[in-house]
Every structure is written in C-alpha cells, then in structure tokens.
Amino acid sequence: MWGALRSALRPCCRAAVPPQRAYHGDSVARLGTQPDSASSTYQENYEQMKALVSQLHERAQYVRLGGSEKARARHTSRGKLLPRDRIDNLIDPGSPFLEFSQFAGYQLYGDEEVPAGGIITGIGRVSGVECMIVANDATVKGGTYYPVTVKKHVRAQEIALQNRLPCIYLVDSGGANLPRQADTFPDRDHFGRIFYNQAIMSSKNITQIAVVMGSCTAGGAYVPAMADENIIVQKQGTIFLAGPPLVKAATGEEVSAEDLGGADLHCRKSGVTDHYALDDHHALHLTRKVVRSLNYQKKMDVTIEPSEEPLFPADELYGIVGANLKRSFDVREVIARIVDGSRFNEFKALYGDTLVTGFARIFGYPVGIIGNNGVLFSESAKKGAHFVQLCCQRNIPLLFLQNITGFMVGRDYEAEGIAKDGAKMVAAVACAKVPKITVIIGGSYGAGNYGMCGRAYSPRFLYMWPNARISVMGGEQAATVLATVARDQKAREGKQFSSAEEAALKEPIIKRFEEEGNPYYSSARLWDDGIIDPVDTRLVLGLSLSAALNAPIQRTDFGIFRM
C-alpha cells in the first residue's frame, strides 16, 4: 500500500549513548536506543504489557462474535451474512478495516450484554474510496438501538463529517430499544440526530448510501429514505414507519411485512429504494458499483513521501512502557518505533523539556508530534502552544502522545503564571483546525488531558493503549483531598478524625477511581475510539491520517493569548 525508502543519514543517538557531533546537512535526526532486554525493568514491563495485550485480544475476539450462538445460527439460516462478513465482502480484497469503539457497551448494562454496542463502525476502502461503514448487528438484541448504539452511530457520522468520508449504512435493525426509549429518543444527540446528520452530510456532498439487508422499522426507515442512493434485498429487507403489529393495532389492517415494506413494493411502486438485490452478496456487489460511480477524487493538502519502516521492532514498546504508570520512560523511544525511519526533527529540544515536540512522517504523511516526558511547566506549555501554531501555519496534522499527570502546581508556579501559560496551550489546541489525533499511552489526568487534546478538544481520532488510565486525578490524590476535607470538617465541629476513619473513607474512593479510570470503562462509554495494541499504533495512525486527509485543511484562527 505504501512504498519504502531507506536513507543513509547517520543516527543521532540519545540518552545512554554518547552524543555525536551535529551536522547541518542532516535535516532530520534518527531517534531511539537499543533497549537492554535483559534488564529486570524491561522484562517486567514486557510481561505486564504482554498480559494486558493478550487480555485485549481475548476480549476483542469475544466481542467480534456478536450475539449468542443461537442468534447467529438463526441469522445465517435466513440466508443472511453475519455483519462482519458483510463488511469483509464490501471492502476491497486485502485492504484493512479500521474499526472503532469495539468495546462500546462493555459491562455497561449489568448482565445484559451488548457486544460492540450492537453496531459495527469503521473505515474501509470500497472501490478505492475510503468510506465510513456502519453495520447493524441483528444478532445482538435484534439490532435494536441502546443508548450506546445511538452514541456510537452518531460518533461514526461525526468522524465521517469531519473527514468528508462517504457513508455506507448496512441496515438490519428493529429500531429503538423500547424499554430504554427515554435514553435513546428525545434528546439532541439521540436517535433523531442520525437522520439530521444524514441530511447535513448530503447537503455538503458527503455521499450517503443505505443497504437494507433486514428490518428497517419506525424512525430507522429514514436511514434509506434519506440516503442519496439505496439498495434493498428481496424477501429480506423491509422498510416501514410502522410494522404489521402496529398497523393492526392502529387501523385493524392485517398485512405481512413483505407486502407492507418489502423490496418489490419499494422498488416497483413507492420508489423509496433504487436497487433490487437478490441476496446479501448481490447487494454488496451493487454497493461497490454505486461507490465506483461517485466520481470521487481524493485531493490532499500535504506532501507525501515514500514510506520507511522504523529502525526498531514495534514489540519493544511493551518493554519500554509497561503497565506501571509510576515508572517513567522517554517518549522519544515510543516515537522512534512509530515514525518513518525513526526520524524526528525535534523542536526546542533544550527548552521546556518535559514536553517533546517535533516533526516526522508516518507512512509518508507529515505529522507534528507532541509527547509528554513529565508534568507540564510554564515553559513546556508555551513551547507546546508555539508548536501547535507552527503546525497550523504549515497545514501539518498533529499527533498527541498522552502520558500526563497535569500542570505543575504550587505557590511559586502560580506566581509565575502557570494558569495563563497552560491556557495558551489549551487555547491553541482547541483552535487548531489541522487534523488532530490523540493516543493515550499512559496516564491522562486533569487539565493535562485538555492541553494534550483529550476528547473535549475534538481530535479526529482518539485511541488508548491497554495500560492507559484516564481520570480527573489519581485515586490516591482524590482520596487524600477528600480525606483532608473531611478532617477539616471534623475539626470545625471540634471532633477528631481518626486514622481508621480516614482509611475507611479513602479505600472505596481509590477503588472507584481505579475502576473508572480503566480503559475498558472509557471505551464502553465512547470516551475514546478504541483500545489498540501498542504494536498496531503505527498502522492505526497511518490509516487515520489517510482518512483525515480526505477533507481540506481549514485555516486556523486563534483568539487572545493572555501574555
């Protein structure tokens, strides 16, 4: 997919390696050192991360099954392909599928399992065009929409809108989950937003294609009705605002689902659908033909260079980072294992050194990287804001590698203006219109999450490693703060606050923060776009950058920076 090129630039070593003379002719230095794989720290990190990755793959495999074995058997007995098989038959042979939010709904509804939130979303290449694919999974609760299903569908549309990706909806759904209608129907970002988004995207020439491969009931009927072009499968796909039971209850009329809203009715009489498919395979073949007719040409605002593999194996990331967030690591070692040729043109290397900034390429795409090497000081924040401005001026996408405890606190730092300096970085990140991608490779705490482009700052994509943690602060810190408040309250009342009382107060707080900071807790609620194996980071970033560059890069306008 991407070409390869090796250069003869001499490596510029760091850290444990003696420094080399800098040559002005070398525009970009090589990063990375060979880790001591025999060290106890490396081996402990490796084993811990390997265990987390094994758990990730095991859970992902279970989610990929979809509904129960009985539900899957019933689905295929009707001549239907399973939703993941539909996607495999839709995308170009041998091309990757960048799936989002695999763990949506994970342990979210108690004993009620909703694998992948009952819907599969991701970017795949169809007839050479990168498309957003949204596929209902009818083996999971009949494909009905839980609150998390709606959220995941709407998030997929948001990604499509931001990156100007044609949308393909593989429809097979019973509509809203009625027992949970209060959390799926009335609010701004509930079920109706799906159709609103379709209308808005169509108005912006972002193609909407619907393939009706099963039930399409009630409000869900608007998915094909509002599509630019649609397809329906005979004796399988149905579209109606009210199904046979509701029609009978409302009017007394008895009618079959096929007669009420089948392929013959909608292709021959109502005109609701455009193409008549004989089965799933035929429908997907027709879909590929529709995409081929879009006359789509991708125009990118960046220069692309031939791709190079990093100089270091990706699995060394396991030994470098590990699961213990209290153990520090140099983010440059992470960068060296994901960027082309391990080349990194560092910016302001000697200033604000707890924030690493610089330019690199990933699969030939230019990227400005911002990575954490400790707490953010005023110098780090000002450096980060400056670098964001450079990337916006040059139309270079931004990659944030988050491992941040937050901004530095204390009287001296407040006096030096940490609040206004941190605000500069937060404002720059908020205003930046270049594509922003965030990977949480360690901790993501407090205002550091904001400065490093957390979810609230609209990164095009946000991924987490399985060792990551996200929270307003660490559990120990939160427990200590609340214990201090309780002790002060007792003191005002003239009472003692015993160590036993303090321990009893702190224990559940620490436990709760640990649970809520877990990446699966985050992913279940769509605070991210997926948990990824560190080894896959480079590929995921390459696919994400490629998708993001379907949209023209807009000019960035910054507001007031308090000096």
UniProtKB/Swiss-Prot annotation:
The keyword Transit peptide applies. Its EC number is 6.4.1.4. Keywords: Acetylation, ATP-binding, Ligase, Mitochondrion, Nucleotide-binding, Transit peptide. It is found in: Mitochondrion matrix. Residues 49-306 form the CoA carboxyltransferase N-terminal domain. The modification N6-succinyllysine is found at residues 70, 141, 433, 495. Signal peptide: none annotated. One of its GO terms (molecular function) is ATP binding. It catalyses: 3-methylbut-2-enoyl-CoA + hydrogencarbonate + ATP = 3-methyl-(2E)-glutaconyl-CoA + ADP + phosphate + H(+). Residues 1-22 form a transit peptide. Residues 343-372 are annotated as: Acyl-CoA binding. GO terms for cellular component: methylcrotonoyl-CoA carboxylase complex; mitochondrial matrix; mitochondrion. Residues 49-555 are annotated as: Carboxyltransferase. Coiled coil: none annotated. Carboxyltransferase subunit of the 3-methylcrotonyl-CoA carboxylase, an enzyme that catalyzes the conversion of 3-methylcrotonyl-CoA to 3-methylglutaconyl-CoA, a critical step for leucine and isovaleric acid catabolism. Probably a dodecamer composed of six biotin-containing alpha subunits (MCCC1) and six beta (MCCC2) subunits. This is Methylcrotonoyl-CoA carboxylase beta chain, mitochondrial. It comes from Mus musculus (Mouse).
